[in-house]
């Protein structure tokens, strides 16, 4: 919510722990939630918005990522990056948060800069670093 100078950023590794769906986090205490999971990260963000008396629907979202970090690895199923991006879209929609900008999928990773004072985000997509055999920082 740029007008309120409230913002959040999460780098999700997985859509969920596997035992919960994108419909919500069930059976976990707030202190047990992990921001590495998209559904739990959003739950933590919503909790902090509520603590600040900010309605989630008054906010907007910009989502980035979902790139295939390991395109050389041909496995079965949908790549985790795509699953993360799709989960982010579904979760935000389920909570009435409008996505105003996105840069999702493709190959490689993104570098993101988030200016919380203005709400501006800059991102650039970079190719996989080593042919998909492993990740580097």
Q: Which residues does each PLM region occupy?
A:
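Conserved active-site and cofactor/substrate-binding residues in soluble primary-metabolism enzymes
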Residues: 4, 33-40, 44, 58, ...
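Divalent-metal-activated hydrolytic enzyme cores
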Residues: 83-137
């Amino acid at each position: 919510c740029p007008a309120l100078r409230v913002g959040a950023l999460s780098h999700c590794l997985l859509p969920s722990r596997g035992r919960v769906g994108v419909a919500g986090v069930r059976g976990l205490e707030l202190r047990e939630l992990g921001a590495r999971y998209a559904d739990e990260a959003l739950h933590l963000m919503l909790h902090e918005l509520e603590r600040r008396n900010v309605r989630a629907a008054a906010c907007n979202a910009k989502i980035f990522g979902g790139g295939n970090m390991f395109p050389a690895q041909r496995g079965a199923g949908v790549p985790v990056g795509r699953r993360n991006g799709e989960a982010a879209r579904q979760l935000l929609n389920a909570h009435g948060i409008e996505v105003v900008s996105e840069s999702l999928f493709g190959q490689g990773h993104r570098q993101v800069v988030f200016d919380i004072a203005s709400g501006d985000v800059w991102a650039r997509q970079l190719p996989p670093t080593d042919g998909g055999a492993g990740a580097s920082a």
